[in-house]
From Swiss-Prot:
Organism: Thermococcus onnurineus (strain NA1)
UniProt keyword Transcription regulation, yes or no: no
Protein name: FAD synthase
Cofactor: a divalent metal cation
Binding sites annotated in the UniProt record for ATP: 16-17, 21-24, 102
HAMAP family recorded: FAD_synth_arch (MF_02115)
Keywords recorded for this protein, A-Z: ATP-binding, FAD, Flavoprotein, FMN, Nucleotide-binding, Nucleotidyltransferase, Transferase
GO BP term (any one): FMN metabolic process
Length: 150
């Protein structure tokens, strides 16, 4: 009997990933555990300026290169300026979209928006690594400033 090849489950994760830290690693490893391939979309610098109201510490190209160096990450793209790049998401064709604990939209709302754009993916939220928010880029920047800039 011929062995049928199982379809690989493709997971998509997106984020800023500035000052890569343990919270990012936890998020990406949990996202990877949901499937076989992990594709990451890194936020465009203009998107960071709009959403975070600050300059990214590292440009998108550098953040993408760091992510490409991680064993758990299979592909990396830089998103378009602004909101979700549905054309890119459609091209990636994920089975699952993993969202981080700090991403503001709900799983159901994102699932609806994806469907409106012809993308039939499950949406799963990955929880925080720690109960407190110490593994956040903004908190790390705050600790650096408090410790080294006085």
């Amino acid at each position: 009997m011929e062995k049928r090849e199982r379809k690989k489950i493709r997971v998509l994760a997106g984020g800023v990933f500035d000052l890569l830290h343990v919270g990012h690693i936890h998020f990406l490893s949990q996202a990877k555990s949901l499937g076989d391939e992990l594709v990451v979309i890194v936020a465009h610098d203009e998107t960071v300026r709009m959403q975070k109201r600050r300059e990214p510490v590292n440009p998108a190209e550098d953040r993408a290169e760091l992510l490409r160096a991680l064993k758990m990450v299979d592909e990396v793209y830089i998103g378009s300026p602004g909101t979700i790049d549905y054309e890119l998401v459609r091209k990636i064709n994920p089975d699952i979209v993993a969202i981080g604990p700090d991403q503001r939209f709900s799983c159901e709302r994102l699932k609806e928006e994806l469907r409106k754009h012809g993308i039939n993916s499950e949406v799963i939220r990955i929880p925080y690594l720690y109960k407190e928010d110490r593994a956040k880029t903004s908190k790390i920047i705050q600790r650096i400033v408090e410790t080294y800039c006085e």
